[in-house]
Amino acid sequence: MASKFDNTIVIPASSPEQNWARSVSPCTPSRLFGLSPLSPSPPSLLSPSKLFDEVRLKMQNDQPSPKSPLGKVSKKATAPITTAGTPIVSEHFTQTARSGSSKAKTIRNRKSSKSQEGQNKILTGRVAKATATSKAKDTTGSKLNAGTKKTKTTSNSQDDKPTKEAETKKVVDSEGLNLEEALKRRSDWTPPKASVPAIISLDEDSPSGNCGAKTSFGYSLRDYHYSRDNSVSEAILPRKEGNPTKRRRLELVESEILQERKPLQQRQTKDAEKTRKTKAKPKKHPKTITARMTALYEPIDETEGLFVFDEELEAGEDFKKPAKPKKKTSTKQKEPDCVILSPAAATKSLNDQNFLFGTCSQLERDDSPTFFEETQKAIRLSENLTLENPALSTISTVPSTTSIVIKYTSKKSHWSEAARDFHGAVVQPEIIDMTDSPTIDTALSQLSEMNREAPKMASLVSAKPTSGIKPLTEKEIIPSCRPTADIQSTSSKPKSNKIGPDIVGKKAEPSTKKPTNQLPEMPNFNGYTDVELRKKVKSYGLKAIGRRKRLIALLDKCWQSKHGNVATSADDVETSSLAAINGTASVSTARISDTQVSEELPVRKKSDGESKAASRAGKRKVVEKPAARKDETAAKKAASPIRTSSYMVDEIEDSEEEIIPSPTRIRVQRQSSTRQTTPAIGCLPLGSKSKRPSTKNKASTFDECTLIELQSSIARAIRLQTRPKNLLTNGSCPPQLTWHEKILLYEPIILEDFATWLNTEGFALVSEDREVGVALVRTWCESQGICCTFRA
C-alpha cells in the first residue's frame, strides 16, 4: 500500500480553491460535439433532450466534490487526484500506474494528433456570458471532467452506461438543465437572401428524414451560413480603382464570374470610346489679336478626354444622367456684336480716327465732332491774330479830358517761379487776345452805364486809343503763368473796380487842369526775366546781384534817379515830390487836381556816358537816403489820412530782411514797386500792419558801389585761399577744408567765423583794407545761394 500512495498528490480541504489553467488545444466542432466530416446534404434538427443524454450520464457517474478544482494531469500520468476528505481513485488510473509508462505515451500521442487535426480547421470563438452563476461553472467543470474521463475509461465502464443514463435523465428532469435565460432576439435583423428554395417533404419515411434524425447538432449550424448560388450571377459594378485591393481574398474569386466580367469590360470600353468622341468639347476660338497670333504656336492638348472613361464607369449604365435636348440651330446666324479686326485693319482705322483731347465732362457730352473741330480752329485763329497784332493786348480807355493806359500785370506765384527753362529764363506762354471779343465790349458798355448814374465815379467812353498815346510793345508786356491778370493804371487817382472776370481796372476822376509836362512811365521790372534784369543793371554800369528782388529795387532807383520823380498818389493822401525831398509832407482832404499821363519809352541800350551819369546819380540818391529818413518820422507823425490805403509803399533796404516774408509783405512790395515816388517816401497808413524795424549794421553805411566792390573782394579772397598744411599730425587727421571747398560741399558756413577770416586773412590776399560785418557776409551768401547760419 505504501507504493500505491507514493505518487499520490494530496490536497487538503482547507486550502483555497485554485484556478487551474485550461488546455490551449483548439475547440473544434468535432471535439465539442463529436461531429463527423461535413456532409453535402443539410441535416435535420434534433431535440435538446437527445443532445444532452450522454452528458447527463457522465455527470451521474463522476459526481466530483464541489470544493475540488479541476483535475490536472502532472508530468507523471499515473498520479491520481484526491482530496483529504474522500480519496477517489479510479480503476483506470490504478491500472495505468501498474502497467508503466507505455500507456502514458499513447495518451500523449493521442493529444498531439488531435491538435494536429485541428490546425486545418476553421477556428470558432466561444462566447462566455457575463451573468453566469457559480452553479453553471460547476456544471461546465463536471462536463469537462466527464469528457476527459470518457477518453480514459475502459470497457468495464461502458457496460454501466444504460444505468447511468437513466439516472442522469431523472436528475435533469427534476432539477432542469441549469441554463441561463436566453437573450431577447432582435426582430429587425436583415434576413439572409434565400438563394436556394427550401424543400420541405411531408413524407416521414423519406431518406432525408431518416438521415436528419441521425445527424448531430453541428450539422444544424450549417443552415445559418450564407451560401451563394453560383448559377445566378450578380451585376457587378466596376470599381473606380480598377485593381483589387490588398485585403481582397483571392480564394473567393470564382471562374464563372471572371468569364462574365470580361465581356462586360469590353462592352464598357466601347461605350466609353463613343462618349469620348461625342463629348469632346470644341475649342474656343480666340477673340483677341494676341490669342489669334499665339494660337498657331500652342501645343495640341491630348489630355482632354483622358478622364471621361472613369467618369462614365463611375456613373454606371443604370445611373446615366438624361441627356439634355440639343437646341436646334437656326438657319440665320446672328451677326456678332463686336467685329474683331485684324491688326492691319485696326491700325488703319486708328490712323483715320481724329483724336480729341478735353476734360471728361467735355468728352462725355453728346456734341458732334464738328463742334470740337470748330473750337480748335477758333483757338488757332485767335493765337494767330495775337501774334500778328501784339498791340491789341492792351486796353486803352480815353475819357473826355484825360486818357488812361491800362496794361496787364500779374503777381508772382509758385507756378511763375517754376516756369523756367534750363538757362533760368521765364518760359514765355502763348498770349491769347481777348480784347476784341464781344463779351468785353458788352461788359464795358454796362460799366459805363453804371458810372453815369454814380456822381462820384468817372464814366468810361469808347475803347479807341488816341493818337497821342503809344500802346505798349509786346516786349514790355510779359504775362505770367497765372490765368488772371491785373490792369494797373498810372493815374493821379486810381480806384480798383472789376471790369471783367480776368481784368481789374483803375479809374480816375477827370482833372480840371491839363498836364503841363508828360513824364515817362517807369517800366514794371517785375515782369522782366532774370536775364533781362541783369542786362538792364549792366546797362546802368552796375554789377548784377544774384537776388531778383534786389535787382528790381536797384533798377527802380536807377530809373528814378535818371528820369526824375513820377507823380503818384495814394487814396485821400495829397503829397508833393518837392515837399517830400525837403522833408515836409502835408495831408489834405481835397482831390488831386493835376494828373500826369506817363508814356513808355522803348527799351534800348545806353551808351557808356549815359550809364556812368546814371550810376553817379544813383550813388547820390543812395547817400541822401539816411538824411531823408530822419525827416520821414516827423511827416509820419503829422499824417492823419481819412481812409486807409489799399497798399503801402515799402522802402527796400540793403539791411537784414526776413528770410521768409509774410504774404502781406510780399503783396505790398509788389504793389509798391510801380508806385514809388522817391526812395525817401514811406507812408504807413492807419489800420495796416506795422513793419518790423530793421536793425542797423555796417552794411547800411556803404553805398551800392562799395557793396559791389566788397562782394567781389569776398569772392576773390575765397578762391585765393590755400589749404593749410598739417605738420604736427603727420597726415593722420583729414586735411582742413578751405572756404571754397566747404561751399562746394554744401557745408553750412558759420557767418561769424567767415567774417573773422575775411577781416584777418582773406582781404589781405586781395589787398583790401576795409572790413565787413556779419550782415554783409550773410547778404553775400544769400545772393550766391550759399548755405549759411549763425553760431549756436
Curated annotation (Swiss-Prot):
MF term (GO), any: 5'-flap endonuclease activity
Basic residues: compositionally biased ranges: 276-287
Acidic residues: bias regions: 650-659
Coiled coil ranges: none
GO cellular component: Slx1-Slx4 complex
Biased segments, Low complexity type: 77-88
Subcellular location per the Swiss-Prot or TrEMBL entry: Nucleus
Biased composition (Basic and acidic residues): 158-173, 258-275, 601-613, 621-635
Keywords: DNA damage, DNA recombination, DNA repair, Nucleus, Phosphoprotein
Compositional bias per record (Polar residues), positions renumbered to this chain: 92-104, 669-679
Keyword match Mitochondrion: no
An example Gene Ontology biological process: DNA replication
PTM entry text: Phosphorylated in response to DNA damage.
Major place of residence: nucleus
HAMAP family: Endonuc_su_Slx4 (MF_03110)
Family indicated by similarity: Belongs to the SLX4 family.
Record text on subunit structure and interactions: Forms a heterodimer with slx1.
Function: Regulatory subunit of the slx1-slx4 structure-specific endonuclease that resolves DNA secondary structures generated during DNA repair and recombination. Has endonuclease activity towards branched DNA substrates, introducing single-strand cuts in duplex DNA close to junctions with ss-DNA.
Stated name of the protein: Structure-specific endonuclease subunit slx4
Organism placement in taxonomy: Eukaryota, Fungi, Dikarya, Ascomycota, Pezizomycotina
Gene: slx4
